[in-house]
């Protein structure tokens, strides 16, 4: 099928009865790019790349499962009536906060089993996670979901965004806030900041700054969305969780500052991989 930018079909292609969605492809691309960047980062902290494979592999799998379970729990009245749709993730419906929770818990467990420092591993993968999130939001765009409230075309034009985004924000006769784009830009900016300043940070601080940065952006973007998971009629789950994560991040940051540890990336330059590499430990 031809790719039409004026209206993007959520289905990338079909193989017989099987439809492959852009949503899944983009999420997979985000994970792969994040994995590559994390592997490159290992060269500068003295860890062999094989030390990270199990952490990322199991965290990605159980994080993805947790993301779906989290979404289903907060939409249980619907899924209780339609249980056959619970595994249909290609229709969308995964919650990033659920994925983070599942991935973090799994990562800590694997780190303990492999005798790895979870703060060190967290610092290595944090830039990769936020970049993957920024890329993954384009999957929501392809699915025509996770948008904000109604706006005018003039409003979108004043944002100076590409025309194909404006046209695909025209859904069932109404233009909507491209909240996917707001969050994607915020996440990618966070990625650039983290890999630029991480060599000046102490162990554990890159990860905690990721938590704080992502949560601040998510809190404000969530307020614009029309499909939020709601705890009550006035409390959005994602905003509540974001506030909790900001507090947790600040507590960890203060603790790590009091308990001094040197920078993890003394030899790594921002966005460059040509400085002297640390001796690799297997």
Swiss-Prot record:
Disulfide bonds: none annotated. It is a multi-pass membrane protein. InterPro entries: Lgt. Its EC number is 2.5.1.145. A 1,2-diacyl-sn-glycero-3-phospho-(1'-sn-glycerol) binds at residue 137. GO terms for biological process: lipoprotein biosynthetic process. Keywords: Cell membrane, Membrane, Transferase, Transmembrane, Transmembrane helix. Pathway: Protein modification; lipoprotein biosynthesis (diacylglyceryl transfer). The keyword Transmembrane applies. GO terms for molecular function: phosphatidylglycerol-prolipoprotein diacylglyceryl transferase activity. Its main location: membrane. The chain crosses the membrane at residues 18-38, 55-75, 89-109, 203-223, 235-255. It comes from the Bacteria. One of its GO terms (cellular component) is plasma membrane. Belongs to the Lgt family. PANTHER family: PHOSPHATIDYLGLYCEROL--PROLIPOPROTEIN DIACYLGLYCERYL TRANSFERASE (PTHR30589:SF0), PROLIPOPROTEIN DIACYLGLYCERYL TRANSFERASE (PTHR30589). This is Phosphatidylglycerol--prolipoprotein diacylglyceryl transferase.
């Amino acid at each position: 099928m031809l790719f039409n930018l004026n209206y993007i079909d959520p289905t990338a292609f079909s193989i017989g009865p099987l439809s492959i969605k852009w949503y899944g492809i983009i999420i997979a691309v985000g994970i792969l790019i994040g994995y590559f960047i994390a592997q490159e980062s290992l060269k500068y902290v003295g860890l062999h790349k094989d030390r990270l494979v199990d952490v990322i592999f199991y965290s990605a799998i159980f994080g993805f499962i947790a993301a779906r379970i989290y979404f289903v729990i907060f939409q249980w009245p619907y899924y209780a009536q339609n249980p056959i749709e619970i595994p249909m993730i290609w229709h969308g419906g995964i919650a990033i906060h659920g994925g983070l929770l599942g991935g973090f818990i799994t990562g800590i467990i694997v780190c303990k089993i492999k005798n790895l420092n979870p703060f060190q591993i967290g610092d290595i993968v944090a830039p990769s996670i936020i970049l993957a999130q920024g890329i993954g939001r384009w999957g929501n765009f392809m699915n025509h979901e996770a948008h904000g409230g109604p706006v005018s075309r003039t409003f979108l034009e004043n944002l100076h965004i590409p025309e194909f985004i404006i046209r695909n924000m025209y859904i069932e006769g109404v233009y909507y806030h491209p909240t996917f784009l707001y969050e994607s830009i915020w996440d990618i900016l966070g990625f650039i900041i983290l890999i630029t300043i991480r060599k000046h940070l102490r162990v554990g601080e890159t990860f905690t700054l990721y938590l704080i940065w992502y949560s601040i952006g998510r809190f404000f973007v969530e307020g614009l969305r029309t499909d939020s998971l709601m705890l009550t009629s006035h409390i959005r789950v994602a905003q509540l969780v974001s506030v909790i994560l900001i507090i947790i991040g600040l507590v960890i940051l203060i603790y790590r500052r009091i308990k001094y540890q040197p920078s993890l990336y003394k030899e790594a330059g921002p966005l460059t991989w040509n400085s002297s590499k640390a001796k690799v430990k297997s």
